Amino acid sequence: VRSFIADRTGGIPDPFTARPASRQITRAEAAAGVHIDAFRRTPLHDEHIALGARMDRFGGWWRPWHYGDHVAEYWSVREAVSLGDVSTLGKLIVSGPDAVEFLERLYPTNIADIRVGRSRYALLLNERGHLMDDGMICREAESRFVLTFTSAGASHAEMWVRDWVDTLGLRVHVLDRTMSLAAINVTGPLAGQLLERVGLSEQPRFLQHVRAEVAGVPCHVMRLSFTGEMSFELHHAVERSVELWRSLMAHGHDLGIAPHGLQALQALRLEKGNVIVGMDSELDSTPRRLGMEWAVKMDKPDFIGRSALARTAQLPDDRRLVGLTMPGMAPIEGSPIWFDHEVIGHVASSFTSPVLGHAVMLGWLKRAPFPEQVEVDGRSASVVRPPFYDPEGSRARA
């Protein structure tokens, strides 16, 4: 092609845009994964390897799936104390004179009544009222907020936030701290005792957050819970992450401390009925379909997706994410849900609960009225309202 063009034009001009050098890779390189590993690593990656972790790719990151025994990791959270690497969470700082007004438009929950030092869970919706992401809103000052997002959705959420800053023309500054801040989740009934040992004597209560030193490392300490147990997220500079991790592991040795991977976390969060965006949700999932109407304040004058939610609220309830329980082992995710000899949905997440001794699931039912008993994997399953474990939330608030 180059010769053909050169013969007829007298030469090929130099490229007018910069372009990095590239070449084809060999089959051996492709098989080995050379040059094609686009997944990021947290600053604790080598610590996980040293502890025997089986690493897997999830949400754009290499993350520990388990450390050899996911059931033992599960029990370390339920009965003692455990560490989880949550550095992969998206982290944005939104500040400026119009920060409150901007976030009121961005989120379907109330923002103005979040007090300084308090946090709130929030959904991120698009214009159609469909769930894009979720996370926490932490108010640090009257006009300064820290937002967190899911690991897989962080990049898109950042672009979404910046686009709406430009669209609304408000006086807001957005700073992405996803790669400059690491985070460790200290979770379990002995989490508070461990943190007291490493200098955090005045600990935030549930849904509060403080700036404090933990084991000599400056941290933004957020009290929340994805596991259903007492939990503290320690957000800190990436260069201090290994130091903090090792100190926590050393001080928690006699407490039975152990790290936990994603496989144990899957069981922990599922027992609490906590949704993972993109795993339990679908592209057109609304808060109503997810059973999360409580996270939407329709009495607000406006927010992204409000008009669409007002319209769809007038339509019949056509599908819903529900909890399911059944004796024995959990069926595989994606299993069809049967009722009256028809498939009426599928299992989104499933696990055999160690503490409950039976299968717990989140699944989609796509035919109203929704039955109370269905069949999954040839067995009877009950349709229930999650959470399955500690429905009052007393353990997380301890």
Model feature map: region roles:
Residues 82-108, 177-196, 316-326:
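Short glycine-/aliphatic-rich beta-strand segments at the starts of folded cytosolic domains
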Residues 113-167:
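Well-ordered mid-protein domain cores that form the structural environment of catalytic cofactors
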Residues 4-19, 37, 285-398:
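Glycine-rich, small/acidic residue-mixed loop/short-helix segments
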